[in-house]
């Protein structure tokens, strides 16, 4: 299955027709959904590839977001090159989620930066996109070197490079620097205060780059951390572990506060990603069944919700030619359908029922409360501030008197509404298929 997906994606790279690529990705998404529903147990193939439910879920999310990013970029320039970049990112992400070796995972983990950087630099809006791309590369490459060092150290200490290895076979001295080994994942998530590259990359990236970055690329950090922590023997009561969780939750709350004072729509959605991914980090680091389940659910829910919000920002940018909140007021007057979709996605972003975010946050809140009452208090504050900045986003764009004359609803806007609806429907109905 994995080889077939890879070959099909390579074939789509060769094709220059955007419509053919969309149809091909749609077929691959349906096949991946079938694989995700069947592969409930873990199976390792040839020592290189593995298949399980999480892998199938992440691959399905990758292809689904790639399709919607295509639809949101119907009027992009240099379509052949754009097609090459997006399919290349999708192929590398599929391979990242499929491999069973930490060394191969590191290779694809870093390889995704190349087409993503070209997408930002080649189709970005402002001259500052070069600086944003430099920030992204420096941050992620620097952190990933520690992960490579950690995997090499564990391999030399007796553990194989397979993700199904047993960490208890490794010397405890090799495990002592586990917090340094996971630095690359913390940057990719990103965890506060390693998040500075993310708002810059989002602001300068085209809509497809923002959708893929927020929807899938950030999930590489959570997925890699999940696989790595399963083989690590980390004491949950250690002082450094508690300190890491405390900084993570405090940073998530501070990122939520930063959302409320943003004036740029893309920055607001980018900082909301930092706040939500801190919950993923808490669930994964708890190393419990409920925590890991909650983290996976939040990753899928956030992937759909954040991608949809970036698509919404692009839709109103095409009409008002500005990302500033003050320039996009009064949306309910000129495009009530888009405002309705903004409300639906904002409500899902604040974990309103029946969105996936609600079920994931309930599980993570339970794990956090079992660990410490102080953690539960901070999680409550994070939930409150999440509702605040989600309502702030909706209220700022829907009410008030607009300062610019915006274009009326046209065929392009109808396509944007379809893309937004395609994000919202699985986000609020996938709970019926949860195991």
UniProtKB/Swiss-Prot annotation:
Compartments reported by the entry: Mitochondrion membrane
UniProt GO cellular component terms: mitochondrial membrane
Pfam families linked to this entry: Proton_antipo_M
Record-listed E.C. numbers: 7.1.1.2
Key words, A-Z: Electron transport, Membrane, Mitochondrion, NAD, Respiratory chain, Translocase, Transmembrane, Transmembrane helix, Transport, Ubiquinone
PANTHER family referenced in this protein's UniProt entry, alphabetically: NADH-UBIQUINONE OXIDOREDUCTASE CHAIN 4 (PTHR43507:SF20)
Broad class of enzyme this protein falls into: translocase
The keyword Disulfide bond is annotated on this UniProt entry: no
Bilayer-spanning residue ranges: 27-47, 53-73, 80-100, 102-122, 132-152, 177-197, 206-226, 239-259, 267-285, 295-317, 324-344, 372-394, 414-434
Protein name: NADH-ubiquinone oxidoreductase chain 4
GO biological process, one term: electron transport coupled proton transport
Record membrane topology: Multi-pass membrane protein
GO molecular function: NADH dehydrogenase (ubiquinone) activity; ubiquinone binding
Location (main, coarse): mitochondrion
Catalytically driven reaction(s): a ubiquinone + NADH + 5 H(+)(in) = a ubiquinol + NAD(+) + 4 H(+)(out)
InterPro entries per UniProt: NADH_UbQ_OxRdtase (IPR003918), ND/Mrp_TM (IPR001750)
Function of the molecule: Core subunit of the mitochondrial membrane respiratory chain NADH dehydrogenase (Complex I) that is believed to belong to the minimal assembly required for catalysis. Complex I functions in the transfer of electrons from NADH to the respiratory chain. The immediate electron acceptor for the enzyme is believed to be ubiquinone.
Family: Belongs to the complex I subunit 4 family.
């Amino acid at each position: 299955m994995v080889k077939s997906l890879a070959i099909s994606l390579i074939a789509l790279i060769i094709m220059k027709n955007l419509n053919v690529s969309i149809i091909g990705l749609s077929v691959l998404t349906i096949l991946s959904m079938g694989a995700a529903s069947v592969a409930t147990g873990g199976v390792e193939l040839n020592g290189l590839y593995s298949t399980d439910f999480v892998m199938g879920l992440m691959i399905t999310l990758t292809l689904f977001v790639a399709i919607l990013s295509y639809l949101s970029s119907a009027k992009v320039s240099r379509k052949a090159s754009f097609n090459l970049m997006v399919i290349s990112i999708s192929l590398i992400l599929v391979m990242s989620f499929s491999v069973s070796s930490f060394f191969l995972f590191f290779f694809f983990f870093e390889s995704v930066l190349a087409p993503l950087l070209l997408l930002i630099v080649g189709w970005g809006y402002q001259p500052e996109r070069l600086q944003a791309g430099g920030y992204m590369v420096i941050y992620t490459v620097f952190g990933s070197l520690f992960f490579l060092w950690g995997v090499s150290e564990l391999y030399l200490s007796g553990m194989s490079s397979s993700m199904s290895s047993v960490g208890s076979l490794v010397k405890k001295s090799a495990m002592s620097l586990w917090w340094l080994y996971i630095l690359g994942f913390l940057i990719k998530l990103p965890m506060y205060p390693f998040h500075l590259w993310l708002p810059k990359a989002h602001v300068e990236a085209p809509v497809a780059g923002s959708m893929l970055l927020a929807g899938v690329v950030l999930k590489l950090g959570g997925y890699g951390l999940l696989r790595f922590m399963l083989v690590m023997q980390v004491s949950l009561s250690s002082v450094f572990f508690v300190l890491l969780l405390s900084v993570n939750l405090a940073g998530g709350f501070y990122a939520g506060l930063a959302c409320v004072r943003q004036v740029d729509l893309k920055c607001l959605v980018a900082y909301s990603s930092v706040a939500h991914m801190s919950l993923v980090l808490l669930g994964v680091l708890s190393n419990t069944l409920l925590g890991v389940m909650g983290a996976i659910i939040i990753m899928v829910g956030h992937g759909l919700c954040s991608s949809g919000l970036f698509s919404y920002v692009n839709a109103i940018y095409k009409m008002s030619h500005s990302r500033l909140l003050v320039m996009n007021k009064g949306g309910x007057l000129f495009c009530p359908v888009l405002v309705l979709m903004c409300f639906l996605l904002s409500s899902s972003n604040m974990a309103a029922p029946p969105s996936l975010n609600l079920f994931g946050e309930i599980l993570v809140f339970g794990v956090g409360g079992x660990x410490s009452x102080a953690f539960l208090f901070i999680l409550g504050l994070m939930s409150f501030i999440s509702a605040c900045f989600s309502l702030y986003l909706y209220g700022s764009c829907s009410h008030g008197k607009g300062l610019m004359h915006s274009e009326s609803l046209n065929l392009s806007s109808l396509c944007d509404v379809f893309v937004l609806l395609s994000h919202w429907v699985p986000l609020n109905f996938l709970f019926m298929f949860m195991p």
